C-alpha cells in the first residue's frame, strides 16, 4: 500500500536552504533540490565518500585507556581534553559532499516542489504546469531529470565543492563543526567535456577518487557520481553508467524505479487516526530506503544528504556509536525492511579486524571493541572520551545483532554472526572488569552519556546505571544465546551474577550511579537504558513498575529545557513502556512540530524558538526521525518473550477511531496485520516466516505455525457487542 498523499513532501519555492530541500536518494547517491527555479541547485552526495587522510599530527602516544583512567582518577580535565578531545577539532577524517549541479533556463518566480513518496519521484511546477521531474534510479548511481519540450534549451553545469588547498585558516570551532571545506587540502579537479559529457574527476586521497558527470540528451538529462580507488577507474565507471542510462532511456529507467518502490511499500503499511504520526512513519521509511542500500555504506549522521553550505557536515558526518547509529537503525525490523537495516550489521561485521586491533591498542585487551566516535574505517576520531571511548557502547552495537535475530528468527545468523560478535565483545569487557571490595565487578571508570559534559564530574562512581545495564544485558543475552544454540556452560551466568543490581532511588527511580541521581534536565536518558532500549524491566512486574513510573515521572518533572530532538522520541518510548499512549502521542507531536524541517529532516534544536527547549541551533541528523518511527510502531505492537500484543499503548483519543497496520514484524519473524473499525470490530492475521509458537495477548491464546502458515482472528469489543 502506497503512502497516503498527506505524507508527501510538498514545498513552495524558492527553497532557501539545503536542509529544507527536496531529498532524493537511492542508498548509493543522494541529491538535494533547492534554490530559485531559474538557477536550481542539485546537491550531490555519494554514500561512503570520505576524506580518510589523517592529519600530520597523529594521535598522542598516550591515547590509551590506561592513560584515560589515570587522568580521570586525578581529575585532570585539561590533559584529558588535550590528548583525547583535541583530535576531533581537526578537519579530517570527514565525510565530504561530491558537488552540485545547476540547472539554468527554467522560468523565474515561485514554484511548487513535491516529492511523491510512493514513487520517489520529485516534480516541480508553476501555475499548475509541471516543468521538471526528477528521480534517483534505485539500484544504479544515476539521476534522471525530465523536462517538457518547452525547456529543451536549459543548460546544466557542474561544480565541485569549495574545497581549499589546505592553507586556509580554520574558523573558530564549535561543538557541531570544526570549520569549512576550505581547510581541506585537495588537489584541483580535472574537468571532463568529452562525448557530450560535462563534469570533473576529483582525487580525494591515496585511497579514494570520484567523478561527477552529467549528459544532456534532448529534454532528458542524466547525471552520475561514482567513487573508486583512483581517478581513472572512477572516470571509466561513471562514463559506463551514463552510457547505460542513455541506452535504456528515461521512461524505462523510471518504470524500473517505480516498480522497486512499489515492492518496497508493499512490505508494510499503516493507517492511523493521526496524520502527524503517519507522516513520521512513512517519511522515516522513505529515508531508510533512500539512505541504506545493500552493498553500500550505511547511513552516517546525515545519511546520503551531506551538507552543501561550504562547511564540514555537522559532527563531520561521522558514525556515533553512543546513540546515533543505534537509533538510526532501530525501527527497520518491525517495519519489515530487514534488507535495508542489515546494511549496518554487515558494515560492523566487516570492521571486526579493526575492532580487534582497537581493543588491543587502546584498551589493552583481547576481543573486539570499536571506538564510539569513528570514521568510515572504524578509526577513532576523538571527542569527549568518557563517551567517545566508552567500551560499553560496543554492547549497544551487540544488541543490534541480537535484535535482528530476535525479529527474523534466523538461527544461522544467530550462530554465525550474533554469537561470535557478542563473544568477542565480552572478551574485551571481561578483561576490563575488576572485582571491588564487595566482590562485585566494576569498570575502572564509568560514565553516562552525556551527563556533566566533559567535566571532571562526568566520571561517575562505577558502575553507572548506563554501564551496568549494558553489562547485564551482554552477559544475560550470552546465556540466552548459548541456550538457544544448545551449548550452555554456565560461564556467562557466573560473570553476570557478580554484577551489582541497578541503582534505584525510591523517589526518582533509576539513578545515574550508586551515589548520584539525575538532578537537572538533560538530553540523554542514558541512565534509563534498562527501560528503553534494552527492555530489561517489565511493567507487568510490580517492582519494575514502580521503578519505571518513578524514572519517567522524574524526567517529566525536570522538564525538556535541555532536551534535543531525539529526546522526545526516547521519552515517547519510555511512556510506551508503561502503556501510556497519551504521553507518547504528546511527545511525538512536540517532536514533529518543533524539531523537523519542512522536508522532514530532524534539525536537533528548537530552531523555531518555540520555547520547548533551550537549544535553538539546527544541525541536521537523521537518528531522531527513525526513533520517532520506532515509537509509532511500539504504540501499535509489543513483541517480547514470544508474547504479542496489538495496541499496547493506544491513546485515549483513538479508542473509537479506525486503526490498521499490515505486516509489521514481531519476534521470530511473525508478520502481524491488524484492523479495528470504528464500530469496534477487530481483525488480526498472523503469518509465520519461521516455525514457532506465540502467545497472542489480545485473543488470550497460543498459536503454533509452520513457516508460510497464516491464522486469522476476529472479535468485538465488549462494550460494542
Language-model features, listed with the residues they occupy:
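Extended, hydrophobic alpha-helical segments in both membrane/secreted and soluble proteins
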Residues: 324-327, 393-404, 417-431, 567, ...
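Conserved positions within tetratricopeptide repeat
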Residues: 81, 342, 415, 419, ...
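C-terminal capping/lid segments that line or modulate ligand- or cofactor-binding pockets
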Residues: 19-49, 54-55, 67, 316-339, ...
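A conserved hydrophobic secondary-structure block that centers on an alpha-helix together
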Residues: 128-132, 137-142, 403, 407-413, ...
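The feature captures the catalytic groove of carbohydrate-active enzymes
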Residues: 300-318, 366-416, 430-493
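Aromatic-residue-lined binding/catalytic grooves and analogous aromatic/hydrophobic interfacial grooves
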Residues: 2-381, 441, 483, 489-559, ...
Amino acid at each position: 500500500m502506497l503512502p497516503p498523499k498527506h505524507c508527501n513532501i510538498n514545498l513552495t519555492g524558492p527553497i532557501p536552504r539545503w536542509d529544507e530541500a527536496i531529498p532524493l536518494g537511492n542508498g548509493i547517491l543522494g541529491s538535494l533540490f533547492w534554490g530559485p527555479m531559474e538557477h536550481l541547485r542539485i546537491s550531490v552526495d555519494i554514500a561512503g565518500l570520505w576524506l580518510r587522510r589523517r592529519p600530520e599530527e597523529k594521535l598522542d602516544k598516550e591515547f590509551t585507556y590506561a592513560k584515560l583512567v589515570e587522568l580521570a582518577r586525578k581529575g585532570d580535565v585539561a590533559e584529558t581534553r588535550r590528548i583525547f578531545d583535541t583530535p576531533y577539532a581537526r578537519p579530517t577524517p570527514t565525510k565530504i559532499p561530491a558537488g552540485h549541479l545547476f540547472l539554468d533556463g527554467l522560468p523565474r518566480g515561485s514554484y511548487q516542489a513535491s516529492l511523491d513518496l510512493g514513487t520517489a519521484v520529485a516534480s516541480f511546477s508553476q501555475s499548475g504546469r509541471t516543468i521538471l521531474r526528477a528521480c534517483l534510479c534505485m539500484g544504479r548511481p544515476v539521476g534522471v531529470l525530465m523536462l517538457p519540450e518547452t525547456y529543451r534549451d536549459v543548460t546544466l553545469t557542474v561544480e565541485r565543492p569549495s574545497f581549499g588547498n589546505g592553507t586556509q585558516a580554520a574558523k573558530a570551532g564549535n561543538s557541531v563543526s570544526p570549520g569549512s571545506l576550505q581547510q581541506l587540502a585537495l588537489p584541483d579537479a580535472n574537468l571532463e567535456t568529452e562525448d557530450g559529457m560535462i563534469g570533473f574527476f576529483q582525487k580525494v586521497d591515496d585511497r579514494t577518487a570520484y567523478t561527477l558527470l552529467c549528459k544532456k540528451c534532448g529534454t532528458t538529462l542524466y547525471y552520475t557520481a561514482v567513487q573508486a580507488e583512483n581517478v581513472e577507474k572512477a572516470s571509466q565507471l561513471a562514463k559506463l553508467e551514463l552510457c547505460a542510462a542513455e541506452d535504456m532511456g528515461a521512461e524505462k529507467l523510471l518504470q524500473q524505479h517505480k516498480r522497486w518502490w512499489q515492492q518496497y511499500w508493499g512490505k508494510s503499511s499503516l493507517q492511523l487516526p493521526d496524520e502527524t504520526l503517519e507522516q513520521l512513519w512513512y517519511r522515516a521509511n522513505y529515508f531508510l530506503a533512500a539512505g541504506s542500500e545493500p552493498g553500500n555504506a550505511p547511513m552516517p549522521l546525515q545519511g546520503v544528504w551531506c551538507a552543501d553550505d561550504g562547511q564540514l557536515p555537522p559532527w563531520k558526518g561521522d558514525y556515533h556509536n553512543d546513540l546515533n547509529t543505534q537509533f538510526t537503525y532501530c525501527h527497520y525490523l518491525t517495519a519489515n525492511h530487514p534488507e535495508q537495516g542489515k546494511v549496518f550489521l554487515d558494515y560492523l561485521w566487516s570492521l571486526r579486524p579493526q575492532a580487534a586491533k582497537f581493543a588491543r591498542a587502546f584498551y589493552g585487551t583481547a576481543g573486539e571493541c570499536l571506538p564510539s566516535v569513528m570514521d568510515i574505517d572504524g578509526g577513532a576520531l576523538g571527542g569527549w572520551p568518557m563517551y567517545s571511548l566508552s567500551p560499553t557502547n560496543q554492547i549497544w552495537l551487540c544488541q543490534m545483532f541480537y535484535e535482528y535475530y530476535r525479529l527474523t528468527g534466523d538461527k544461522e545468523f544467530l550462530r554465525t554472526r550474533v554469537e561470535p560478535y557478542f563473544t568477542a565483545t565480552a572478551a574485551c569487557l571481561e578483561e576490563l572488569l575488576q572485582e571491588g571490595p564487595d566482590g562485585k565487578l566494576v569498570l575502572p571508570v564509568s560514565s553516562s552519556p552525556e551527563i556533566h559534559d566533559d567535566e571532571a564530574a562526568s566520571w561517575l562512581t562505577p558502575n553507572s546505571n548506563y554501564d551496568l545495564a549494558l553489562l547485564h544485558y551482554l552477559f544475560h543475552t550470552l546465556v540466552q544465546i548459548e541456550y538457544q544454540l544448545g551449548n550452555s556452560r554456565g560461564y556467562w551466568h557466573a560473570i553476570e551474577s557478580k554484577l551489582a543490581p541497578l541503582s534505584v532511588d525510591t523517589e526518582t527511580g533509576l539513578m545515574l550511579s550508586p551515589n548520584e541521581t539525575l538532578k537537572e534536565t538533560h538530553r540523554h536518558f542514558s541512565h534509563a537504558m534498562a527501560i528503553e532500549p534494552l527492555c530489561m524491566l517489565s511493567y507487568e512486574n510490580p517492582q519494575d513498575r514502580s521503578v519505571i513510573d518513578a524514572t519517567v515521572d522524574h524526567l517529566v518533572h525536570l522538564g525538556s529545557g535541555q532536551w534535543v530532538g531525539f529526546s522526545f522520541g526516547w521519552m515517547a518510548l519510555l511512556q510506551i513502556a508503561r502503556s501510556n499512549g497519551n504521553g507518547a502521542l504528546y511527545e511525538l507531536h512536540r517532536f514533529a512540530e518543533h524539531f523537523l524541517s519542512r522536508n522532514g529532516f530532524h534539525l536537533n534544536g528548537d530552531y523555531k524558538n518555540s520555547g520547548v527547549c533551550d537549544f535553538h541551533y539546527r544541525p541536521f541528523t537523521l537518528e531522531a526521525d527513525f526513533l520517532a518511527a520506532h515509537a509509532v510502531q511500539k504504540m501499535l505492537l509489543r513483541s517480547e518473550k514470544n508474547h504479542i500484543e496489538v495496541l499496547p499503548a493506544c491513546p485515549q483519543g483513538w479508542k473509537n477511531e479506525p486503526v490498521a497496520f499490515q505486516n509489521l514484524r514481531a519476534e521470530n519473524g511473525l508478520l502481524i496485520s491488524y484492523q479495528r473499525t470504528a464500530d469496534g470490530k477487530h481483525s488480526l492475521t498472523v503469518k509465520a516466516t519461521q516455525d514457532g509458537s506465540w502467545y497472542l495477548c489480545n485473543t488470550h491464546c497460543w498459536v503454533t505455525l509452520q513457516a508460510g502458515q497464516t491464522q486469522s482472528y476476529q472479535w468485538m469489543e465488549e462494550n460494542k457487542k
